[in-house]
């Protein structure tokens, strides 16, 4: 595939394991470029994937361009899967697999409009699969508790038998590994400052969110700034309009068709300005298309989620809340 790098990530892991002394502890991060953009146009269909079987998220128009773009994305995800498969096989061949914590995850959501570089589910919810036969009871469980990727740091520290520093605000997953139900894992707290420098002065778009089972509440600290980057490509480090969103066939189509009926609303959600507060009722609106902040019937929920978020930000000493005037 033209867009997939020729880096042999799994082969690099093999070389690393060859250099590790016998019985010595090790840590390795296998980070691939895939599925970062750009993709080979038409790669998905070329591998026999059927566009008709694609489940198109409601945040995108449903047409042949978008379906093909998603299939091309799948090709690169499968390449990552292949590298992970080979790495796991290497651990098994060397007898390390059962005593190694294997974590498979991602740093953000899919590189599409209103996904990556946003606090909506398509931007912040990522896969997380953990394998550790000697440390996880009842393996194969589908755990519904909210976790953060920052929880991995105290988890690794505790698994190694060391004390977790009190300054860490994240929580170890070891109790989940042991099968305990965690009553305090009923929400996820999400933060973003910027992706690329795509606004005047290189400024970001600071926002914070709390995600519960039923609601997503977002607070945008600078609603006067363009959330997806300025429409003026001259102020973007990548010289593209709305540069927080990676260039793609989906983005191009939505920009070119943003005045058309049925697409204008989706384009506004992806590229337009956003209010200071956003609230989404996930039972009625799982893909977060209708902001109900400001509606009378949701005022109590909005107030409660705002207080929940800001209590957490104060507790964790977020500089946007406790640091005085912030210049960036």
Describe the role of every protein-language-model region.
Residues 12, 16-19, 176:
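CheY-like receiver
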Residues 206-207:
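Short, acidic/polar N-cap/turn motifs at the starts of alpha helices
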Residues 170, 318-328:
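Short, flexible loop/turn segments with low-complexity composition
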Residues 171-176, 184-193, 203:
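Polar, glycine-rich mid-to-C-terminal structural blocks
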Residues 211, 216-219:
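Short hydrophobic-aromatic micro-motifs
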Residues 5-6, 188-198:
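Extracellular glycoside hydrolase catalytic/binding regions
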Residues 1-4, 17-168, 203, 216, ...:
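Active-site-proximal cap/lid insertion segments
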Residues 21, 178-183:
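Basic phosphate/pyrophosphate-binding loop/patch that engages nucleotide-derived ligands
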């Amino acid at each position: 595939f033209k867009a997939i790098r020729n880096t042999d990530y799994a082969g690099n892991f093999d070389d690393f394991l060859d250099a590790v002394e016998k019985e010595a502890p090790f840590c390795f991060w296998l980070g691939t470029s895939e599925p970062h953009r750009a993709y080979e146009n038409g790669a998905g269909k070329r591998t026999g994937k059927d566009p008709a079987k694609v489940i198109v998220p409601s945040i995108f128009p449903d047409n042949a361009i978008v379906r093909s773009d998603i299939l091309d994305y799948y090709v690169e995800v499968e390449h990552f899967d292949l590298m992970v498969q080979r790495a796991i096989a290497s651990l098994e061949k060397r007898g390390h697999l059962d005593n190694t914590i294997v974590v498979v995850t991602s740093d953000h959501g899919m590189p599409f409009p209103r996904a990556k570089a946003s606090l909506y589910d398509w931007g912040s919810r990522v896969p997380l699969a953990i394998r550790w036969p000697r440390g996880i009871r009842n393996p194969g469980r589908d755990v519904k508790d909210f976790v953060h990727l920052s929880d991995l740091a105290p988890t690794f520290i505790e698994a190694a038998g060391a004390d977790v520093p009190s300054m860490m605000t994240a929580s170890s997953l070891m109790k989940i590994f042991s099968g305990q139900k965690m009553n305090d894992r009923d929400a996820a707290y999400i933060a973003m400052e910027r992706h690329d420098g795509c606004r005047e002065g290189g400024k970001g778009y600071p926002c914070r969110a709390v995600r519960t089972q039923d609601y997503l509440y977002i607070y945008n600290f600078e609603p006067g700034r363009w959330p997806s980057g300025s429409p003026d490509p001259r102020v973007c480090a990548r010289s593209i309009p709305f540069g927080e969103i990676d260039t793609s066939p989906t983005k191009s189509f939505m920009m070119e068709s943003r005045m058309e009926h049925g697409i204008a609303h989706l384009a506004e959600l992806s590229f337009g300005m956003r209010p200071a507060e956003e609230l989404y009722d996930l039972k009625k609106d799982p893909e977060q298309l209708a902001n109900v902040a400001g509606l009378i019937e949701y005022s109590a929920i909005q107030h409660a989620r705002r207080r929940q978020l800001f209590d957490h930000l104060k507790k964790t000493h977020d500089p946007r809340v406790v640091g005085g005037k912030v210049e960036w």
